[in-house]
Curated annotation (Swiss-Prot):
Keyword field contains RNA-binding: yes
Entry-linked InterPro entries: NCBP2, NCBP2_RRM, Nucleotide-bd_a/b_plait_sf, RBD_domain_sf, RRM_dom
Protein name, as recorded: Nuclear cap-binding protein subunit 2
Subcellular location(s) of the protein: Nucleus
Annotated source species: Culex quinquefasciatus (Southern house mosquito)
Length: 160
């Protein structure tokens, strides 16, 4: 008899629109994955801070920081891959919605990290969602689309 693993933490409605494969294959991978997408991070959150928080739920295989595809600087997301599915379920249950660097983090299932996904998919190099923000968020580190469209001048920053 075949055993089908039912996650103790439900899958979200979000699906990666760039997934290379069928919807059925993506669902299967999500149900069995030990990889999580972590969103709404501060641009200043370090890999060490993420490791400290998420290792409370189990042994971490790796953390892949999300980077601006042009500047190669952190852009507010990462992937956390555990060795065991149960540890990722603990993180979904206990860390999703908690604060890290004074931001409420979003934790969601991921079908598994593939090289290249660490780069932001937005036109300006960061995340798409940041391009639609209308405010300046110090924790996120940018003005979003308003600067890109010339609606605001770039913030005053001194170069060291």
């Amino acid at each position: 008899m075949t055993s089908v693993h039912t996650p103790s933490v439900a899958l979200s409605k979000y699906r990666d629109q760039h997934f290379k494969g069928s919807r059925h294959e993506q669902e299967r991978l999500l149900r069995n994955s030990s990889t999580l997408y972590i969103g709404n991070l501060s641009f200043y959150t370090t890999e060490e801070q993420i490791h400290e928080l998420f290792s409370r739920c189990g042994d971490i295989r790796r953390i892949v920081m999300g980077l601006d595809k042009f500047k190669k600087t952190p852009c507010g997301f990462c992937f956390v891959e555990y060795y065991a599915r149960i540890d990722s379920e603990y993180a979904m249950r206990y860390i999703n919605g908690t604060r890290l660097d004074d931001r409420i983090v979003r934790v969601d299932w991921d079908a598994g990290f593939v090289e290249g996904r660490q780069y932001g998919r937005g036109k300006t190099g960061g995340q798409v969602r940041d391009e639609y923000r209308q405010d300046h968020d110090l924790g996120r580190g940018g003005y979003g689309k308003m600067v890109a469209m010339g609606q605001l001048g770039a913030p005053n920053m001194r170069e060291s």
